[in-house]
Amino acid sequence: MSSQWDEDSDADILELANKPPRGTQLTQIESHAETETCGNDESGTGARTHEDLDKLQMDLMTARGESGMLRDRLMMLQQEKDRERERLLGREQELQGRHLQELQKLQEELQRLEDEKQFLVLEKRQLVKGHIAAGLPAQDIQDDSTEVSAKRRKTEDSLVQTYVTLNHTRVVTGDSSLFLDHMVLFKLHGSDMTVLDMLDHISLESPASCSMLVIPSGEPLGKPIHMMLLRLKSMHPLDKMIDIVLENLAMLIKKIMQGKDCRFAVPFLVAYMHQALSFRPSAVHVHALKDLFQFSSDLAIKFQPLLKSPLHASPLELGVEPNIFQYELLDTLSLFYCFDVMELCVKYLLQCSPESQKSFFDEIIWKNITKVMQLSLTISYKSILNVVFSMVEILRALSELITPEELSTVQWWDSAISKLFQLWNRQVSNANLHDNDNLHVLPKHNFPGLNRCLGDSTNVHLIEELIDTKAVQAIPEVIYRDFPPFSRECKIRIEGWGLQLHKATVNILQQLLLRYGKQLAHAELLHQTAKFLCREQELLLVVRLTADSHNSDMRITLAEELIRLLYHAWQEHEEPSKAITEVQNELIACLWRVVFGHMSNRDPQTQPELDALLLDSFHGLSLKEQHDLYDDVFDQPAAQAFLARELAAENVLRCETQFSGCHAYTCREMAKSVLESIISLEDTDSLFLAMVSE
């Protein structure tokens, strides 16, 4: 048994001896297992946390890598784009340079061929002269000329035809862009600031909003309007763009007039509407013209206190009001601009079709026209010549338009004609500004309109003085009532506008006679026409004959138009002689001067050159100045003598025209026909013997 034990058995016995008892060993095993289990749980939780962090870190690194790759890709694309742009620019410059070189070569080739052609022509001439001098036969000369002609044809055939190439990089400006420039650069007459610049310094006390305009309180008006134009440019065609601009401006003006805000921006907005309307008449539809005319007439009626200024100052007024003018200036400008817009609307309507003209008018439009006419053409209040002129032009356009018969009746035109007769009874003069029987412009109304300028625009600087260029305000700057007097040139200018006003009234009556005929050719028309003609001729011969005025020719033209009107009304009336009983003698003398005052009936013993010198010496001086200028230009004595005779004949013709009050042959024949129908042949002979010295 002892032989069976070895060293391995001894090791096993020692290991068993060192082990604890079985119960104690089981407890230790269980506690060790629990400890190992807790440790494993804690290590598993920590491992999972580390795994999540590692995963998030890996995702972050992946995202950073992808973003870096995208950034590099974008940089590569941008560099490629820059290289492509540089390549295209270089290609364009190369093509332009090549094109210029080709043009230069073609020009040089053309010049060389032209020079060769000239040399061939000179060579031919020299050969022909040499053959003639040497006495060569004509056959040789013909052969040489044939050879030269063949060379010339060959040269002409070899010429390269040049064509104008198209510039593909040129950008053609569209209608909307032109309209935008037209609106942005708009300035009032005599003003240095654009209307948009003025509106940039004007604000509203309360906010206002339209379909495409949103204006906060205290903010300038110019920027929203400019932004609206920029948006419309890229969204709509020209006609729709103009309609939307007019609609939004009208809505904005209406909100200002109905609210409690100051009317500071109203005249500038109305002027902006006029500018939009005047860009291209063909792009404005009839319904837009109708809406704009109705809006302008309603707005003008709101300013009727300006049109109802009393003729005489009330003795009850103490005159202690402040000497400021800015608010009256704003209302005056708004009134002038409204009438200018109405006038432009009816003038554009003349270019439309007859159906469109009829569709323009309705009862509301016609009532507004009647109301505006009653306010502007009145004798109960002080007349404003700017407004009167616009109203007469509106009536002139209405007389040429095709209007509905139920609205444009003979009775309505009779009332309008009676107001025109009131204008005939008022002379045109600025000599006395307190005389209400004259048509004149007051110094406070010496402002330019949108269609015309009746004065010299002396007060135009006051419009810019309303604006504070360093701030944005809702009220205007203070303007005092201090107006300079009219100059002599300005008075002559206003007189000329007044004569044009009278001429426009005569044209209205002529047009109405063509339309209605005998219905309007009543006794009052004949009486007023004869009375006006006699007065104008007397004024021309007695007062204006020796006056140095540029309006004498216009007065003669007015007299000719009155003779035509008198003749047409005379032909339409059944018993015209009874209508002129009160002014018959004056009319006979007037017509006699027209018929027999021509140079063909002049006494041969008189000296017309002396009469012309006595009549208007200043005109003779102007002709002498022209003669001196012609002498400096022409050196030939024959030409100088011819020009001297022509200028002298022109001076005599002007003298004869002023003496007779008429120079047109047709007018003399019309006056002769009327004169013969007034008096008999025996009375004509007696009158001739009484008025012509033997």
Swiss-Prot record:
Residues 68-130 form a coiled coil. InterPro entries: DNA_damage_chkpnt_Lcd1. GO terms for biological process: chromatin organization; DNA damage checkpoint signaling; DNA repair; establishment of protein localization; telomere maintenance via telomerase. One of its GO terms (molecular function) is damaged DNA binding. GO terms for cellular component: ATR-ATRIP complex; cytoplasm; nuclear chromosome. Keywords: Chromatin regulator, Coiled coil, Cytoplasm, DNA damage, DNA repair, Nucleus, Phosphoprotein. Residues 1-13 have a biased composition (Acidic residues). Forms a complex with the serine/threonine kinase MEC1 which activates checkpoint signaling upon genotoxic stresses. The MEC1-LCD1 complex is recruited to DNA lesions in order to initiates the DNA repair by homologous recombination. Required for cell growth and meiotic recombination. This is DNA damage checkpoint protein LCD1. The lineage of its organism: Eukaryota, Fungi, Dikarya, Ascomycota, Saccharomycotina. The gene is LCD1.
